[in-house]
Structures are given as structure tokens and as C-alpha cells.
Amino acid sequence: MSSLNVKIQDVFDEPACERNRSKDSNARSKGCSKPLTPGAAAGGCAFDGAKIVLQPITDVAHLVHAPLACEGNSWDNRGTASSGPTLWRTSFTTDLTEQDIVMGNSERKLFKAIRQIREAYQPPAIFVYATCVTALIGDDIEAICKRAEETCGLPVVPINSPGFVGSKNLGNKLAGEALLDHVIGTVEPDDAGPCDINILGEFNLSGEFWLVKPLLERLGIRVRACIPGDARYLDIASAHRARAAMLVCSTALINLARKMEERWDIPFFEGSFYGITATSEALRQIADLLVKKGTDLEILDRTDALIAEEEAIAWKKLEEYRPRLKGKRVLINTGGVKSWSLVHALMEIGMEIVGTSVKKSTVEDKERIRQVLKDDLQMFESMSPRELYAMLSEHKADIMLSGGRTQFIALKAKMPWVDINQERHRPYAGYDGTVELVRQIDLAIHNPVWSQVREPAPWESRPATQEPLPNTRPDTDATSVGRSIRRHDAGDFVEC
């Protein structure tokens, strides 16, 4: 069995996942992916999943060993943000052609590309991604990366996650395995402290982690590594010296959190920064874990004081929206951590949840939703575009929160819509982010355009009148006039 197959089977056997533990050995070996529906979009592949997790590491050069389309279709697939380096925004690919593949030139081309990147950009590390084509022709990227690392004198990390091996979620986990095998623990920090933590599965979408990080800094807590949002290579390499960790998206990186706890005794919990209550609870749990690891008890008092102050400010800002949004019905079509954290956040201001998608949610996510909604009928695994349109057009919801792929369903139904997926341009995390989310929902629902587009069109509201058809018969008067013209005699046509 190849090393990739061994790694995949190891990822499929995840003791920290309740759904995985409930399976027998035969079902566990198949993973959590469901068969694709013929004719439907397949969604992201394993390569796409690995790229999503690792691309936000901002100072690393990400080199895709593939034909041009693999990098062209995956570049900038998440709206993450960087507070410093911009190298991650540059696209690198070996751009394999048919001739490279037929003539066996692909491995030589990869080594040359690594050397060129090192000479031109001097990155702290280079990540090399395997893809379907290069995996099928048998390119040994691990051997090439090892040789390039010895030659160039910098870390060259192989990301062995070709698209055909599985789903996007599997690619997420294989990316975490690559960090464990080649990056984390390779650098010893000289400034490790008692209040260092890791944030796992936080992608810093639209810079939203920047709304949370100042809160942690006010408590004296340092983020040793945020993986992957706005991360630096050296921060991740020294992440093994953190004292505690918070897991934001367990669907993607639960294997990374569990193995870091096993190897380096870094306890973790799963939490969310979406919503006022969820943010406060996350801060308290971080403080509790640090105290258990030996931090001064004073941090608990500081945390309670900070939470009381920030909650008072946030609730004061939300008061103007509460009467305008109370009782409004929301349909949430997303997944993962947002499927339960947004439910709680919106119910806090009096909105009613008519349904939330749990397609990408874990067993723990679903249990959290049940505790809040008390009704399994409000959770749906998947809903077809036709069903979404029917639900919105029949006014069973006042607004839909989803990603860009379903926005036109809401617009066709003439209903408000707010983007909450990775393509969005506004941050919604933390106390300030919650206020911003509520503000955007209020703007969408009360936008005057909806009352206008729902009115009948002018030609639909005008009373029908039957206009007379034009007369195509010859005019009687004109005929009589024609008949009154004098007749010509033979003399009229005599040549002059």
C-alpha cells in the first residue's frame, strides 16, 4: 500500500469524531463522502481542499505541479486577508504540457520551478501540490522536494493530495497531515509564554479574525499560530509550544487538533466567534484551558470584566435593530460551524429560524442546533434549488443567508439575501462582527427595492382594453372616385 493510501486510511479513522466512532471498520474505511449525483456539480476535490487550508499562509510560495487549469481554477478561492506578506497572492504552477508528460519532463520542470522561486522570491518555505495528472503519471514529488530542500537550503513541503483521492473535506485533513509531518515542531521559539494559544480552522475571511485578536491581546493572550488565516510559516513551525488551542472548524482540521494534543499535550475545545454569546463562551473556555495549564487565576477575572464591557457595548448598538428585526424569519443555507453558531446569534436578537442546512455539519454541530431549535424538522441535509425557491416565493422566510451559489434563487424569488460564505467582503466574527451582520440583515430586509420589484409591472396592472382592428378593406368612397375618372379614347394615345 502506498504512503498516500496509508495516510488516507489514517485520516478516515478519526477517534475525535463521534460520527466516525459510531461506524464499523468497513464503513469507516470509506470516509464520509457521499456518492455524487449524476448531472449535479461535483464540488471541490481533495486538491481544492488542501489548497483552501494552506493558501492563507501568507509568506509561503504555493507551487502547483499540474497543467495550468488546476491553479487557474483554484487561485483565490477564499476571501482571506493578510496583514503583511502578499506572496500567497502570487500564482505559481509548473504549467505542464502534453509534451512534458509524454517526454517525461515533468519532474525536471518541477525541480527547476522550485529553484527559480527560491532565487526570485526568497520565501521561508515552498509548498508543492500534487494533482491528478502528476499523481497518475507517477511523479515522486516527495523525493523531488527532499532533493530541492537539500539543494536550495529552505523547506520544500510536499502536499500529496491529488484531486481524485476524495472530497474537499479529505483534502482539508490531508493538508493538516502535511503540516504535522513537515512543518509543526521544526522550529523552537525563543519567546514561548504561559498564555500562548493556537487557533485552528480560522481562515480570517475578510479579515474577521482581526476583530477577535485585539480581545485576546487585551487579556494578555498571544496567538502563537492561527492556522491558516493570516499565518506565517515560522509561526506554524513553532505552534507546538502553545499551551492551549481553539478549534473553529472541526470539519476541516479536527485531526490536526487531536494529534497536536497527543504529541505535545495541547488541550483544545471547539468553539465559535459568531454571535455575542458564542464569542463570550469562547473567551471563557480559552481562559479556563490556560488556567488548567498553569496560568495565573487572575486571567479569569480579566476575562469576565472584558466580556461584561464588550457585551454591554454590543447590546447597546443592537438595540436599534431589535424592534425592526424581531420576528423576522431567516433561512440559513450554509454548513459547518456557521450552521449552529449563526442560529444562536440571530435568535439572540429575536429573529426566527425557519431552517438551517447541516450538510457539512458534524454530529456535535447538529446536537448544538437541536439544543437551540428543539425541532429536527428545521434542519435539512440538502435542499434543491426548486425547494429553496418555493420556500422563498411562498414567503415562508423573510431573508436567506447563504453563499454566492444560491443568491440568484433568492433574487428570482424577490427576497433579500446576505452572503455569509467565504466569498463575502465583510467580517462577521466577534462582538463588532455580530453588530455588522445584524446591520447588513437589516439593510437587506428593509431595502425599499423589494417593495418596488414585488409590485406588478405596469403592463400587468393596466386594465385590458380591446382595440379595434385596422380596416384592410378598400374604401368605398375611393372606389367611387376611381370610377368617376373619365374614360380615355383612342386619341389620347396617338403619338405626337
Curated annotation (Swiss-Prot):
| Listed CDD domains | Nitrogenase_NifE_I
Q: Which InterPro entries match?
A: Nase/OxRdtase_comp1, Nase_comp1_CS, NifE, NifE-like
Renumbered to this chain, region (Disordered) spans 455-491
Query: To which pathway does this protein belong?
Result: Cofactor biosynthesis; Fe-Mo cofactor biosynthesis
Keywords annotated in UniProt: Nitrogen fixation, Plasmid
Q: Does the keyword Transmembrane helix apply?
A: no
Among PANTHER family, the record links this protein to: NITROGENASE IRON-MOLYBDENUM COFACTOR BIOSYNTHESIS PROTEIN NIFE
Physiological role? This protein may play a role in the biosynthesis of the prosthetic group of nitrogenase (FeMo cofactor).
Indicate what this protein is called per its UniProt record.
Nitrogenase iron-molybdenum cofactor biosynthesis protein NifE
Query: Which taxonomic lineage is given here?
Result: Bacteria, Pseudomonadati, Pseudomonadota, Alphaproteobacteria, Hyphomicrobiales
